[in-house]
Amino acid sequence: MVVDLKQEIMADPRNASFTARGLEPIYMIAPTVKILIIGQAPGAVVEQTGILFNDKSGDRLREWMGIDRTTFYDSGLIGVLPMDFYFPGKGKRGDLPPRKFVAGEWHQRLLDTMPDVELILLVGKYAQQHYLPIKASESLTSVVHRFADFGPRYLPLAHPSPLNNIWLAKNPWFETDVVPALQKRVADILKK
């Protein structure tokens, strides 16, 4: 079924330019996934390597989660489902946002192949706005600060990018409140 979905995604006319360049949709799923990370679209480097979070952002995310690279990539217990499966391109102020149809059309069908998901980490505003009952005007800071309101299934996070160092410095509660709660939840799920 997962292979069929991948072929459907590649055959979607809206993805034709990516498929024509030999690019496959980028996500990391398995029927055994217990913790799913839903984040932004892959960047240009990920488009070339096909490996999600294989950078400083990934190092920080794994640190926040309290897990190592082997658990992240090889255990079959961690999945990653971006808000777009392809790099959407560069804009005037950074990467373009994920294309809106991707999550609406494909996420639930892919989620249905992972029946054991207990925790979904929503990394960044696009994922949070899609999955949480929040107002479009609510800031990422406010949503992440209210992380306990969305449990136990969802846990909103800031993006772990080094570009967010200023945000992290301005919001020390993230490291003192959110990260320990995240690490405990992840550890509890993984030891089952």
Model-derived features with residue positions:
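A polyanion-binding, active-site-adjacent surface
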Residues: 1-144, 148-189
